[in-house]
Amino acid sequence: MRQILRRRSFNRSERGQSMVEMALMMTMLLVVLSGVLDLGRGFFSFIAIQNAAAEGALYAAINPRCRDASVTGCGNPNNVVFRAQNESPNGLVDKQKMAITVSCDDGTTCGSGALIEGQPITVTIVYQFQMLGPFSVAVPNGQLYFKAHAVQDILDVK
């Protein structure tokens, strides 16, 4: 009988210990989990802008003069910038944070110079990724910049 009473008093002094341990571990687990979610979002965004650059370069290889909607006859959706911006599903990558440039091998913007079939054309995208988790304080303003580029040879000069 004495052992039973001792056991109860021993357990009584540790009452709530598991709740405190769970609260401490849950806090650390949530911080790590939010960091992993940010990493996943960043990886998805990086893959999405790589796909967007590839889509833009493919369209630029077929229609090298249609860089953006300002060119006559190249209104949306028939231009490189529109194709690159709309490659990713809606809402997952912010189109407003994409900076898209189209350039030819000689560094020009491919608009005024003579375009030659077989000449490389490059689409470069710089994307501003906003981190949301607790590790966002580790980078300036909580923003990372992802850069992707794709190169295709001009297939048809129209």
Language-model segments: residues:
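Intrinsically disordered, low-complexity boundary segments flanking structured domains
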Residues: 45-46, 84-91, 134-138
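Low-complexity, S/T/G/P-rich flexible repeat/linker segments used as non-globular hinges
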Residues: 2, 130-158
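Transmembrane beta-barrel outer-membrane domains
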Residues: 23, 116-118, 141
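Short amphipathic secondary-structure patches
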Residues: 51, 55-126, 156-158
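A generic fold-level signal
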Residues: 14, 116-118, 145
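Generic N-terminal initiation segments characterized by hydrophobic and/or small/turn-forming residues
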Residues: 1-2, 7, 36, 89, ...
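Alpha-helical assembly-interface signal, strongest on the long, hydrophobic N-terminal helix that forms
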Residues: 2-84
